[in-house]
């Protein structure tokens, strides 16, 4: 019998899930600035992102558009966030330059 690993392939022990306003725009930003690869995206009939997954280096993040009817609100909607993400990249100067271009 094969052993089932408790962490799915491509994931780490902790995987952040971001709720944002304008998830499609955020995905493009993460691709352009951090070199993220889009693993998958599920869009609703209105085009809003219901769920998406990105790979940045060896880490996966999940994100979706805010959906207040389900209790999911973005930091913008609640006036800030108690959460920070630390992203380790080999060339910080390049990332800063890209972030200024794609802001």
Language model features with spans:
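A detector for short, charged/polar N-terminal pre-domain segments
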Residues: 1-12, 73-75
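General secondary-structure propensity
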Residues: 1-2, 65, 88
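Core segments of cupin and vicinal oxygen chelate
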Residues: 8-10, 17-61, 66-67
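Vicinal oxygen chelate
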Residues: 13-21, 50-55, 72-98
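Conserved small/polar residues in nucleotide/adenosyl-binding loops
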Residues: 101-103
